[in-house]
């Protein structure tokens, strides 16, 4: 959260997220369940606390959980998960298919020339890929639940050659890019017939160290933004 101007960032790194914050039901005091992506996904989607030294999505026998994806599936929703990297990373493909998701899209689905590093494709490609898939689901007339896991603000950073950041450090340039890619996704989504009937929930899976570490587990590791946006809801904080 501390990369956003609303939470004290002196530079304007996230103009789109900052603007979306004021147009959403937004939460100032929201904290992640852990400090790794698997912690955030597990807690957010299935409402179980993270086990700090254990990845509960891994294992030869995949446990079944009740959570948002499974409850929605029981009520007629079609569930899709989009990630940038390989499906086997953190056992995500097998875990999510076992626990409520109908389709999982990962690096294996994307053109090889779009893979830029060990974390697969970049955010803007993931968003561009997702739009037509969501259009196909919307055309069926059935409700859908889609989870998009972005990755760009995670080292190793890759700044696309077509993106021109205003700052000079890779750590801030990648934040600018991630914000730009998200803006581009919303601009495209707004053109689709399902946009006005969709609730968008944006949150961080975990934080990162911003500034100096004042204690063993700095607040910035867990303090994350949460925004619930729809063209049909009134903003509040």
Q: Predicted segment positions?
A:
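Solvent-exposed soluble domains appended to multi-pass membrane proteins
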Residues: 1-237
């Amino acid at each position: 959260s501390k990369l956003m101007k609303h939470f004290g960032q002196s530079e304007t790194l996230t103009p789109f997220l900052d603007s979306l914050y004021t147009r959403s039901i937004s939460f100032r005091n929201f904290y992640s369940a852990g400090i790794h992506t698997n912690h955030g996904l597990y807690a957010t989607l299935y409402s179980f606390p993270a086990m700090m030294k254990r990845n509960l999505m891994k294992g030869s026998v995949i446990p079944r959980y009740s959570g948002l994806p499974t409850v929605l599936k029981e009520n007629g929703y079609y569930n899709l998960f989009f990630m940038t990297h390989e499906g086997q990373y953190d056992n995500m493909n097998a875990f999510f298919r076992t626990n409520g998701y109908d389709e999982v899209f990962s690096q294996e689905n994307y053109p090889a020339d779009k893979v830029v590093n060990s974390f697969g494709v970049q955010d803007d490609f993931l968003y561009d890929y997702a739009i037509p898939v969501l259009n196909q689901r919307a055309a069926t007339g059935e409700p859908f639940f889609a989870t998009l896991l972005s990755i760009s603000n995670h080292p190793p950073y890759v700044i696309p050659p077509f993106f021109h950041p205003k700052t000079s450090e890779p750590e801030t340039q990648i934040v600018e890019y991630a914000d730009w890619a998200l803006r581009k996704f919303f601009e495209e989504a707004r053109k689709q017939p399902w946009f006005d009937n969709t609730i968008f929930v944006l949150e961080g899976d975990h934080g990162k160290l911003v500034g100096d570490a004042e204690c063993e587990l700095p607040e910035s590791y867990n303090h994350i933004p949460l925004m619930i946006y729809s063209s049909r809801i009134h903003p509040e904080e």
